[in-house]
């Protein structure tokens, strides 16, 4: 069993996760989206790495219902093909939260006390407004162990 598979099994404590047999070398992490906390990401199988601009431009042709995460284009890492065959944008979760935190740190209203408060608020915003919302075509958010 490779290290990424072990990490994922430890993270979710769920032996029912179905890995693709013989594809351990292509396993690079998992994605989360509303209603599905663990979508395994396999390079060149269900993950197509693209630049942010290419991913956003091409997704409109592939899946007109696909949605973007406003203001976070720099965190797009490509497309994720879901089990139902639809394709959605895939964002790097850490990068997205870091962008949110940076925006909070630039806030001059006095709403945030310090860097830790900004980080906590960024994670809260992510869980409530990104991961916690459902609409058709919502993006997925990747936790990558290897690129």
State where each predicted segment sits.
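Short, Lys/Arg-enriched, disordered terminal segments
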Residues: 1-2
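C-terminal alpha-helical interaction appendages
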Residues: 6-147
